[in-house]
Regions:
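Phosphate-binding site recognition
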Residues: 2-437
Length: 437
């Protein structure tokens, strides 16, 4: 899809500014459209999702590739009471039959588990309860009128008081879907963003088994044999093994960076980047942007990291002479990379040689496992290669066979990040050696 920036949005404000604002750090679709920010049109995702139909759909992409913005867009499209003008001029608006059938027609439950980041299981569970409670409050309209009986209303109140026990918590989202279906007489769409963050944080802090059980029960209840469910979409960075938290979900479809379907719906493709650079008068920066931020291979598409491109354009609007930066590394830690480099150093062998080859722009061949659990990520060098690939530190240059891929560092930014981590750990080792008697 190409970019869309409508004159119909805040014409007076746009007239005062030389260019439409760039949405640096903004992941809310309604805000981007209503406040006149530059938007790269990804509404084709809606059409693909409905045409390829899956009752439960999981999308995995590295961080900062537009997952949260796409989920916000899905909510705005399907939710009852939506402002349909948000989609004026966008790709999906051309499909009038689809818009008439689906736009603004369904109750939507939308939660993000990004905030479930705690040092203990008890605190993580409290955070999860808070997220469910806040989402339930967004649907307080169902308490009006007499569509729900007193028992239904009591069930709803149990979700918004913040006093729910674990039994209530694991059934909370299923309960909310049932109440919404009864009120609206429509099946419910469920959106769960950053589904795997609670598992990642639990693994880091020593309560992984407890969190797996909680998340499995929560998801199983709302996603498996739930007669109130229209369909669900989940996003995350890694595809956790189905046996871990998606046990028994026969209605489950996954889409990863290796799949051809949806390969242009997360991240920017070349034409989108060229159009953005042209609009902001940065055509001469194209080769630099491509060298630094392109190089990812999703399905059959060559993809740029949108976070990098937007930040680069924004910075160079103010100062065209700025050198490129490693924008991606500043968004979170690089724990996966640190684990890998430390393990490669400890191995003193092939892994270290492979790392040197990658930094030098060469290709290595490795088997890739997509179905790891979080407590397996660092268990072996083979698993670490898979983790680096899925997390966006490596991309593929083609298959050798079903599970074996030709891997490479995607771009200069990632090469710099890897080099910086290697040098930092080398410096630590030198300092330790200097302290030894």
């Amino acid at each position: 899809m190409v970019s869309v920036f409508q004159e119909t949005w805040n014409e007076g404000e746009a007239a005062m500014a030389e260019f439409i604002k760039l949405p640096v750090g903004i992941e809310n679709f309604e805000k981007i459209r209503r406040d006149g920010f530059y938007y790269v049109d990804k509404t084709g995702l809606i059409e693909q999702l409905l045409n390829n139909w899956g009752e439960v759909n999981l999308f995995t992409r590295p961080r900062r590739f537009g997952k949260t913005l796409n989920m916000s867009m899905l909510k705005c499209f399907f939710e009852i009471g939506t402002d349909q003008s948000l989609f004026d001029g966008l790709y999906i608006s051309k499909n009038k039959a689809l818009c008439d059938a689906y736009m603004g027609k369904y109750p939507v439950i939308s939660i993000s588990l990004k905030g479930v980041n705690a040092d203990s299981y008890e605190n993580a569970r409290s955070l999860l309860k808070r997220i469910v409670m806040e989402e339930a409050k967004m649907h307080r309209i169902i308490m009006s009128g007499n569509r729900l009986d007193d028992i239904d209303k009591a069930e709803y109140m149990s979700l918004v008081t913040g006093e729910m026990g674990e039994d209530t918590l694991v059934y909370s989202m299923k309960t909310l879907t049932a109440l919404l279906e009864k009120y609206y007489e429509k099946k419910v769409i469920v959106l769960i963003d950053e589904y795997d963050v609670p598992l990642a944080k639990a693994n880091e802090n020593g309560y992984y088994d407890q969190m797996v059980l909680l998340v499995r029960n929560l998801f199983e209840n709302v996603l498996k044999t739930n007669s109130s469910l229209k369909f669900a979409v989940l996003t995350g960075c890694l595809r956790v093994a189905k046996e871990s938290i998606f046990t028994g979900l026969n209605n489950f479809k996954t889409n990863s960076i290796l799949d051809e379907e949806y390969d242009e719906t997360f991240g920017f493709v070349d034409d989108e980047v060229k159009e953005m650079l042209h609009y902001y008068g940065q055509d001469t920066h194209y080769e630099t942007v491509k060298e630094w931020y392109d190089g990812y291979r999703f399905g059959n598409a060559d993809v740029y990291c949108p976070w990098d491109v937007i930040n680069y354009c924004d910075a160079h609007r103010r100062n065209p002479m700025l050198p490129p930066e490693n924008y991606w590394t500043n968004t979170s830690g690089n724990d996966v990379l640190k684990h890998f480099i430390e393990s490669a150093g400890a191995a003193k062998g092939l892994a270290k040689t492979d790392l040197e080859r990658l930094v030098n722009g060469e290709i290595v061949e490795k088997d890739i496992r997509e179905d790891l659990t979080y407590n397996e990520l660092y268990a072996s060098m083979d698993n670490l290669w898979s983790t680096l690939f899925m997390a966006g530190y490596l991309t593929h240059k083609g298959r050798v066979d079903t599970k074996r891929f030709r891997l490479a560092v995607p771009n200069r930014e990632i090469r710099n990040i890897i080099t910086e981590q290697v040098l930092a750990l080398f410096k630590q080792d030198m300092e330790k050696d200097g302290q030894r008697p």
